[in-house]
């Protein structure tokens, strides 16, 4: 990014060495942390379809490499059969599934299939953490880089998505890298920056429709900071080459690229009609479109308070010189862009912070800048041991609570709420969605289900029957259990996605004591009930 840091970090090779060590250390720490409990997070609603799709990609690749009829493998019919499988719940372009197929092929035998698939988002997350540390350190110094990486690592909901084999962590990492490369190319040119921007943008496009929006906040930023014509030319050059990358990595586009693009855009813009997903927000259920302030409120109540304060500090201290603070300006534009995007009438906004996850690395950078400003202020007043003690106290005040909360919330990362709303109990009382993606159906809970339910038990499940059939297919849930999606049955398992509750689920949830429950700080996330219909 910019060449002049706000704080002194050394010069030349020494400075570069420390940035490299910081980035590598942050990425390694992220990898070790997530690896330690990646198997503890429940298999999420979408993952079984992605597992199946990745397995089909593995089989197709094996046929292409060593099969007897390689020509037919490349036919439009065979490609559509494999790469367009399960479009209703598996509509996204394939890069994240290709990554899952690769990591499971490499490590599945050693780690198990689920952990092998989940290695892909973990690697993307580690790369993202290292990149955030690098950018923060390059722009504002080592303190900023380290604090930015720590801030992102200590956002429980972001950390949770690093455990889950889905689109969200890959597109978040690729969005950040594409933005980083594009800004660097606009400001300084260079083959490396261009290559980073092109490949990251191309892969983002082929991961999720969201990837197509990468240039929008960059253009808005360039209108303020780089109005010369060369900026537009640079963005267009990157976009054109990125489309070529997207074409190469998406076999569905090989035979009919225009039709593939049209279908992707159409599916993405019609989600409210084809697959409306309900959300519980501030005590009301919304079938698809939420109030405009949902993304803003969710940001404020799902990021640890210390990190929010540092982010506000970093933003506020940059405002007087924001015209010269190009990275801070970019971060502000990125966060506001996602808030504005999700406020639009036709934008999907379900599933907590999942659909605007790419905003959080930029918020983390602002927090890193805030930490750098705190240390700079201390340096003006203190020296030696006093400075060290004060800096340590700052870390404790701003980051230690976030660390303790993140550790305590495991493995229910996606249910985290901060003190502004009263934590998890306060969020439940104020009518927020407490869980949504089946991540609370942990291996430990499934094991207890297997112990409690009698042989050949009939079990109705809400809101999804297919999810538990998939658990049986994965060997997690006993296969003699008969799964139903209709009552009456002797047993009823309710997942606490309250936006989808009918009056039946509300009555059971409020009035009946479960046989087995998943609880977080006194709030029920899932419960197994004996069903006794009332007359």
Question: Where do the PLM segments sit?
Answer:
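Start-transfer (signal-anchor) and selected internal transmembrane alpha helices
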Residues: 1-33, 127-130, 137, 143, ...
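Membrane-interface transmembrane helices that cradle and orient dolichyl/undecaprenyl
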Residues: 6, 139, 178-194, 204
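Transmembrane-helix signature of polytopic, membrane-embedded enzymes
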Residues: 19, 24, 132-154, 187, ...
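Catalytic lumenal/periplasmic loop and adjoining terminal transmembrane helix
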Residues: 35-41, 251-255, 260-271, 342, ...
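Multi-pass, polyprenyl lipid-linked donor-dependent membrane glycosyltransferases
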Residues: 45, 117-124, 143-154, 158-177, ...
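Transmembrane-lumen/periplasm boundary regions of multi-pass, lipid-linked membrane glycan transferases
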Residues: 50-64, 89-92, 98, 203, ...
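Transmembrane-helix motifs of polytopic, lipid-linked glycan transferases
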Residues: 119-139, 177, 181
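Hydrophobic/aromatic-rich transmembrane helices and adjacent perimembrane loops
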Residues: 168-171, 204, 213, 297-310, ...
């Amino acid at each position: 990014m910019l060449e002049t840091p706000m704080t002194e970090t050394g010069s030349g090779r020494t400075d570069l060495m420390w940035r490299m060590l910081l980035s590598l250390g942050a990425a390694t720490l992220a990898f070790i942390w997530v690896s330690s409990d990646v198997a503890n997070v429940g298999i999420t609603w979408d993952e079984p379809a992605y597992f199946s799709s990745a397995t089909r990609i593995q089989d197709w690749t094996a046929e292409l490499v060593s099969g007897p009829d390689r020509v037919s493998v490349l036919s439009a019919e065979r490609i559509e059969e494999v790469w367009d499988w399960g479009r209703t719940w598996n509509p996204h372009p394939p890069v994240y599934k290709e990554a899952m197929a690769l990591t499971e092929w490499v490590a599945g035998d050693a780690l198990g299939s689920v952990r092998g698939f989940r290695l892909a988002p973990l690697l993307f997350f580690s790369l993202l953490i290292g990149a955030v540390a690098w950018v923060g350190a390059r722009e504002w110094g080592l303190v900023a880089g380290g604090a930015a990486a720590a801030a992102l690592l200590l956002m429980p909901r972001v950390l949770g998505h690093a455990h889950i084999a889905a689109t969200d962590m890959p597109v978040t990492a690729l969005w950040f890298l594409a933005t980083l490369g594009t800004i660097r190319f606009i400001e300084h040119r260079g083959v490396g920056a261009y290559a980073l921007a092109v490949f990251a943008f191309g892969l983002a496009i082929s991961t999720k429709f969201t990837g197509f929006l990468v240039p929008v906040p960059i253009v808005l930023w360039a209108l303020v900071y780089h109005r010369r014509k060369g900026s537009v030319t640079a963005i267009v050059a990157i976009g054109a080459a990125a489309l070529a990358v997207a074409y190469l990595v998406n076999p569905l586009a090989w035979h009919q690229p225009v039709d593939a693009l049209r279908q992707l855009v159409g599916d993405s813009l019609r989600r409210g009609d084809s697959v409306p997903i309900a959300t519980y927000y501030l005590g009301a259920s919304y079938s698809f479109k939420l109030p405009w302030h949902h993304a803003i409120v969710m940001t404020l109540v799902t990021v640890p308070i210390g990190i929010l304060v540092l982010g506000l500090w970093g933003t506020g201290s940059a405002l007087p010189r924001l015209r010269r603070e190009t990275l801070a300006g970019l971060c502000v534009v990125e966060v506001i862009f996602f808030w504005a995007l999700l406020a639009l009438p036709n934008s999907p906004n379900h599933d907590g912070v999942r659909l605007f996850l790419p905003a959080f690395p930029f918020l983390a950078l602002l927090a890193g800048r805030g930490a750098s400003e705190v240390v700079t202020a201390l340096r003006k007043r203190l020296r030696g041991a006093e400075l060290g003690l004060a800096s340590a106290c700052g870390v404790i005040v701003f980051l230690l609570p976030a660390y303790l909360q993140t550790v305590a919330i495991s493995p229910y990362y996606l249910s985290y709420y901060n003190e502004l709303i009263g934590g998890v109990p306060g969020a439940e009382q104020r009518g927020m969605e407490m869980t949504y993606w089946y991540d609370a159906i942990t291996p430990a809970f499934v094991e207890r289900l297997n112990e409690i339910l009698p042989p050949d038990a009939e079990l109705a499940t809400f809101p999804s029957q297919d999810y538990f059939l998939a658990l049986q297919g994965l060997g997690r849930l006993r296969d003699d259990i008969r799964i139903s999606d209709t009552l009456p049955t002797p047993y009823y398992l309710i997942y606490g996605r309250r936006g989808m509750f009918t009056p039946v689920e509300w009555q059971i949830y409020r009035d009946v004591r479960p046989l087995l429950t998943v609880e977080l700080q006194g709030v029920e996330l899932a419960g197994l009930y004996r069903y006794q219909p009332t007359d």
